[in-house]
Amino acid sequence: MSESLKNSQQFGNVYKNGKSFANKYLVMYVCKNELSINRLGISVSKKVGNSVVRHRISRLIRESYRLNDSISNSGLDIVIVARAGSKGKNYSEISSALMHLAKLHKIISSSEPDRN
């Protein structure tokens, strides 16, 4: 189960105190929170494309996270920033990039299969 990060103060806290890893499509920041659930924030800047493109990438990231949510640790604030390279990519590429970053952050174990 997870919720969303709601305001810029919550995002700023994750950027400031969290640890980040990146690949060519996404950057993931992770910071512990005081809750028993994960909170997810997604950021897609105007550099990536117009609103249609940005919203599509946001939906792909959210869906990939949702389908793999049951295998993740709890009590984390996670911010995922889409890079310009993510423009035009399909679900499997975004999901694979997200799972790669989750393994680097040790949110999921590397023995768990991708669910895409």
UniProtKB/Swiss-Prot annotation:
tRNA processing as UniProt keyword: yes
Gene Ontology CC: one annotated term: ribonuclease P complex
Annotated GO biological process: tRNA 5'-leader removal
Keywords: Endonuclease, Hydrolase, Nuclease, RNA-binding, tRNA processing
One Gene Ontology MF term: tRNA binding
EC number of the protein: 3.1.26.5
Family to which the UniProt record says this protein belongs: Belongs to the RnpA family.
Free-text function comment from the UniProt entry: RNaseP catalyzes the removal of the 5'-leader sequence from pre-tRNA to produce the mature 5'-terminus. It can also cleave other RNA substrates such as 4.5S RNA. The protein component plays an auxiliary but essential role in vivo by binding to the 5'-leader sequence and broadening the substrate specificity of the ribozyme.
Subunit structure: Consists of a catalytic RNA component (M1 or rnpB) and a protein subunit.
Entries under PANTHER family matching the protein: RIBONUCLEASE P PROTEIN COMPONENT
Protein's UniProt name: Ribonuclease P protein component
Organism: Lachnoclostridium phytofermentans (strain ATCC 700394 / DSM 18823 / ISDg)
